[in-house]
Amino acid sequence: MNTWLLSLQNSNSPTYDMMIFFHDFTMMILIFITLLILFIMFTMINNNLINRFLLQGHFIELIWTITPMIILILIAIPSFKILYLTDEMFNNKITIKSVGHQWYWSYEYSDFLNIEFDSFMIPSNQLNPNEFRLLDTDNRCILPFNYPIRILTTSMDVIHSWTVPSLGIKMDSTPGRLNQSLLYMYRPGLYFGQCSEICGTNHSFMPIVIESTNFSYFKNWLKSFL
C-alpha cells in the first residue's frame, strides 16, 4: 500500500465510490468555470473594441444570475443523496462497537458471545518488515466482506473520530453518545485509518486496521475466542 499517493485512495466500498464520483463531478465543474473565466479575462484584456452605447444588459444579467443557480442545484442533488445514504441503515447482518480511549481503540463483537479486545499501535522498534509504521496494530478488527455491517462508536474519555478513508467512513466517537454507520466492503484486504479528531498528546498514535476476509475465515477467527 503506497501511503504517499496523490489524490484519493482506491475505493473499497459503495459509499466511497459515490464520494469519489461527487469529487470528480465537482472538480469538473470547477475546472470548467475557471477556464471560462480565464478565457473571458484574456479576451477582454486583448480586445480593443469598445461598445459606447451599451448602458445595461438585462439578458446578460439574467444569464449570470440563473447559471450559478443551476450549477449549485446540480452540485446539491448528489451531495444530499450521498449525505443521506451515509446515515442509512438497511439489512445489516453484523454489529460491532468501537470505543475510543486515550490513546487506543477497543472493539466489541456483541453479536458473538460478547467478544472484546483492545487494539494498540505497534511501536516502531517492534514492527515486522511487512508492517507499516504508525499504522499497524497488535489486534486487527476482522470483518467479512460482502456483508452489511453496522458500526457503533463512542468514547470513554474525550472526543475521538473513527476514520477509514478507503472505506469512506468517518464517525465522531463522543462520550455519552452512540453514533452509527453502515460499512460494506467489496473485497478482502487491509484497510488503514487513524483517529481524525485531535484528542491529546498521542493523537497521532491510535491507528485503525480493518482486515476484510471471507466469512468462513471470520467464523474460524471467532471460534478462537471460545
From Swiss-Prot:
Its cofactor is Cu cation. Its EC number is 7.1.1.9. Component of the cytochrome c oxidase, the last enzyme in the mitochondrial electron transport chain which drives oxidative phosphorylation. The respiratory chain contains 3 multisubunit complexes succinate dehydrogenase (complex II, CII), ubiquinol-cytochrome c oxidoreductase (cytochrome b-c1 complex, complex III, CIII) and cytochrome c oxidase (complex IV, CIV), that cooperate to transfer electrons derived from NADH and succinate to molecular oxygen, creating an electrochemical gradient over the inner membrane that drives transmembrane transport and the ATP synthase. It is found in: Mitochondrion inner membrane. Cu cation A1 binds at residues 160, 195, 199, 206. One of its GO terms (cellular component) is mitochondrial inner membrane. This is Cytochrome c oxidase subunit 2. Mg(2+) binds at residue 197. Residues 1-25, 82-226 are mitochondrial intermembrane. SUPFAM superfamilies: Cupredoxins, Cytochrome c oxidase subunit II-like, transmembrane region. Keywords: Copper, Electron transport, Magnesium, Membrane, Metal-binding, Mitochondrion, Mitochondrion inner membrane, Respiratory chain, Translocase, Transmembrane, Transmembrane helix, Transport. PANTHER family: CYTOCHROME C OXIDASE SUBUNIT 2, CYTOCHROME C OXIDASE, SUBUNIT II. It is an enzyme of class 7 (translocase). Binds a dinuclear copper A center per subunit. Component of the cytochrome c oxidase (complex IV, CIV), a multisubunit enzyme composed of a catalytic core of 3 subunits and several supernumerary subunits. The complex exists as a monomer or a dimer and forms supercomplexes (SCs) in the inner mitochondrial membrane with ubiquinol-cytochrome c oxidoreductase (cytochrome b-c1 complex, complex III, CIII). Belongs to the cytochrome c oxidase subunit 2 family. It is a multi-pass membrane protein. Its main location: mitochondrion. The keyword Mitochondrion applies. One of its GO terms (molecular function) is cytochrome-c oxidase activity. GO terms for biological process: ATP synthesis coupled electron transport. The keyword S-adenosyl-L-methionine does not apply. It comes from Lasius sp. The gene is COII. The chain crosses the membrane at residues 26-47, 62-81.
